[in-house]
Amino acid sequence: MLKISRESEINLINVLIDNDIISGKDLPNIKKVSTEKNKSQIDAVFELKLCDEDKILDVLVKEQSLEVVDLSKIQITDDVKSVLPSNYINMNFVAPFKVDGKDLHIAISDSSKLGLMRNLKAITKKNIELHAAKVSQISEFIQKLQSESGDVTTEAIRKENKDKVRTKT
């Protein structure tokens, strides 16, 4: 079962509607399955066979020409563990997976995340490189990341960044 924030779930449902993958007529059925089986609406979409992960990935890749990343093969490094606050990662359903100098590589599942670019750059002070990944891989990666790093707060990131600056001089 996917672990996805309500806000991200709504955004993804809207992307599916906007791309004519599902219709407004499907929503009552999606909500019914979601409620009855205590699953996310995205899981319900998959269960009802209205769409699959590959279709969602294809839409993102075609719309945005993003490179696809297989998060199941990515090792989580220490610099990735503390690059973004846990609550931000959960709320926005983004998976930071690689820090390469001044570049931060982040996997997204749908185009609703494109509006986060400026915010991500402001938080991390890094150039943001977006990649496409399957919804389930992002969900699993976020869970793995947070089980390894614990609850990363904005305050902890600021402190770590301050310490990094001090050690350089």
Predicted regions and their residues:
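N-terminal, intrinsically disordered, highly charged
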Residues: 1-169
